[in-house]
Amino acid sequence: MNSFKNFLKEWGLFLLILSLLALSRIFFWSNVRVEGHSMDPTLADGEILFVVKHLPIDRFDIVVAHEEDGNKDIVKRVIGMPGDTIRYENDKLYINDKETDEPYLADYIKRFKDDKLQSTYSGKGFEGNKGTFFRSIAQKAQAFTVDVNYNTNFSFTVPEGEYLLLGDDRLVSSDSRHVGTFKAKDITGEAKFRLWPITRIGTF
């Protein structure tokens, strides 16, 4: 009995903290690894993000969602809120007929206008067949944001209780244009902080 008391005295606080961390991990936060290039240049392939659960979903949040068809978690940006009409016309976003800026796309839109991202998709991380495939997609596109049929003008009506999610690299992202909108229950958290790599730790 005394040995157990001594154990608790020495390790009790540590075990309590460990238990609280484990419980908070289950209910309040998680981490996720970015897979692929769909969120370039905001988030890069392989980066690890700190994700907070149970936050209200706001437009332009970067969220983690569960894609049922592929049975996987994906990282995308919220563009359409429940009931919205989302329209794109030659890289201009209109939300319920109001033109809305997307500053996070400015860099890649400029590169698209310069050389259709051919230099970008020839750089580090785009070696081999991946780079060839991405360059061919970009060459066919007449705008940076197109639908699945490469139309530059298209629209969505977001059902009530659902959200339209798009990747920041619109040319290569598989998102709501391909798999449809996401229910609130399928959005598991908001990415708030970059944990890895060390050179890019911080918010985005």
Curated annotation (Swiss-Prot):
It is an enzyme of class 3 (hydrolase). GO terms for biological process: signal peptide processing. GO terms for cellular component: plasma membrane. SUPFAM superfamilies: LexA/Signal peptidase. This is Signal peptidase I. PROSITE patterns: SPASE_I_1 (PS00501), SPASE_I_2 (PS00760). The chain crosses the membrane at residues 11-30. It holds the Pfam family Peptidase_S26. Its EC number is 3.4.21.89. Keywords: Cell membrane, Hydrolase, Membrane, Protease, Transmembrane, Transmembrane helix. CDD domains: Peptidase_S24_S26 (cd06462). Belongs to the peptidase S26 family. It catalyses: Cleavage of hydrophobic, N-terminal signal or leader sequences from secreted and periplasmic proteins. It is found in: Cell membrane. GO terms for molecular function: serine-type endopeptidase activity. Gene3D superfamilies: Umud Fragment, subunit A (2.10.109.10). The active site is at S38, K76. InterPro entries: LexA/Signal_pep-like_sf, Pept_S26A_signal_pept_1, Pept_S26A_signal_pept_1_Lys-AS, Pept_S26A_signal_pept_1_Ser-AS, Peptidase_S26. Residues 1-10 are cytoplasmic. It is a single-pass type II membrane protein. It comes from the Bacteria.
